[in-house]
Swiss-Prot record:
The keyword Ribonucleoprotein applies. Component of the mitochondrial small ribosomal subunit (mt-SSU). Mature yeast 74S mitochondrial ribosomes consist of a small (37S) and a large (54S) subunit. The 37S small subunit contains a 15S ribosomal RNA (15S mt-rRNA) and 34 different proteins. The 54S large subunit contains a 21S rRNA (21S mt-rRNA) and 46 different proteins. GO terms for cellular component: mitochondrial inner membrane; mitochondrial small ribosomal subunit; mitochondrion. Keywords: Mitochondrion, Ribonucleoprotein, Ribosomal protein. Present with 2010 molecules/cell in log phase SD medium. CDD domains: mS26_PET12. Residues 295-318 are annotated as: Disordered. Component of the mitochondrial ribosome (mitoribosome), a dedicated translation machinery responsible for the synthesis of mitochondrial genome-encoded proteins, including at least some of the essential transmembrane subunits of the mitochondrial respiratory chain. The mitoribosomes are attached to the mitochondrial inner membrane and translation products are cotranslationally integrated into the membrane. Residues 300-318 have a biased composition (Low complexity). Belongs to the mitochondrion-specific ribosomal protein mS26 family. The keyword Lyase does not apply. GO terms for biological process: mitochondrial translation. It comes from Saccharomyces cerevisiae (strain ATCC 204508 / S288c). This is Small ribosomal subunit protein mS26.
């Protein structure tokens, strides 16, 4: 590590800053050309030395003339093609010619890329400067508008000429559209679900419709014989789905209690003794079977334990 490593943070192998391969501006950099050709300011803000005032030693009284480089002329002078090519009989001569051609090619590419980089840098700086100026103008305009609104009162004509409501932004319009689509879909779903429940109730009640003469005679006999059993053949939710309770209990005074139990377990809000769409969905998803198995395991733990003990005894005897 050399003596000058301290200024690089005591790090070895640090490369110096890169320098441009073009020492002067090119002829395509119009911004520098216009700046050089523009008249110099005079007066207090002028540049230079007044008459009778000597300039400091080692400096120039007049600014040196800026020389612009034409990249094509520079390439023609520095990387010109060889005028005469010697016979390349030997392999060493061929290698030297190939290396010289590669050096010329790489130097030409370096000149072109450096000129393109300078032009791109100038365009980016101009674009960035315009953006910053525009943002500053908008900020100043906003501040001035707030100040003027604080110190003045809106006139009646100005108030009537402006809209009563603010227009929605594109984000707000998109959000409102999504909300409307959601509400429309939800209403359609609820209406469809209501129709399915009504159709299912009609299916249950249709079992009690009298459509034949034999059914009519049978029903008349039941009425005149003072039978106390309710005339319904509806599908029993408790016996067919949940497997706890029986039909007589469902048709007795405990119907409301059984319905509340079913609603609490199945998440249904229906107060009828017929099963609704939610129970059908639970049955298709096998949720009812899982609940029934859990209830059986809770109600009959002794039988399971006895069965296990019997199996253990049989294994021991064997």
């Amino acid at each position: 590590m050399g003596k000058g490593a301290a200024k690089y943070g005591f790090k070895s192998g640090v490369f110096p800053t890169t320098r441009s391969i073009l020492k002067s501006p090119t002829t395509k950099q119009t911004d520098i050309i216009n700046k050089v050709k523009s008249p110099k300011p005079k007066g207090v803000l002028g540049i230079g030395y007044a008459k009778g005032v000597k300039h400091p030693k080692g400096s120039h009284r007049l600014s040196p003339k800026v020389n612009f480089i034409d990249v094509d002329n520079l390439i023609a002078k520095t990387v010109a093609e060889p005028q005469s090519i010697k016979s390349s009989n030997g392999s060493a001569q061929k290698v030297r010619l190939q290396k010289a051609e590669l050096r010329r090619k790489f130097l030409i590419e370096a000149f072109r890329k450096e000129e393109a980089r300078l032009l791109h840098k100038h365009e980016y700086l101009q674009k960035r400067t315009k953006e910053l100026e525009k943002a500053k103008e908008l900020e100043l305009e906003k501040l001035n508008k707030e100040k003027s609104s604080d110190l003045t009162i809106m006139t009646l004509d100005k108030m009537m000429s402006q809209p009563l409501l603010r227009n929605r932004s594109p984000e707000e319009s998109e959000l409102l559209k999504l909300k409307r689509n959601y509400n429309r879909s939800l209403l359609n779903f609820q209406a469809h679900k209501k129709k399915l429940n009504e159709l299912l109730n009609l299916y249950h009640v249709a079992n009690e419709f009298i459509v034949t003469e034999s059914q009519l005679l049978k029903k008349i006999d039941k009425v005149f014989n003072d039978e106390t059993e309710e005339f319904t053949d509806a599908y029993d939710v408790t016996s067919n789905f949940t497997q706890f309770g029986n039909r007589k209990l469902l048709l007795s005074g405990n119907t409301t209690l059984q319905t509340q139990i079913n609603n609490a377990i199945m998440g249904s809000l229906s107060n009828e003794k017929f099963f609704d769409i939610s129970l059908v969905d639970s049955y298709l998803n096998k949720d009812l079977k899982n609940i029934s198995n859990k209830i059986d395991s809770k109600l009959n733990p002794t039988s399971n334990g006895a069965g296990n003990n019997g199996n253990n005894n049989n294994t021991t005897n064997l």
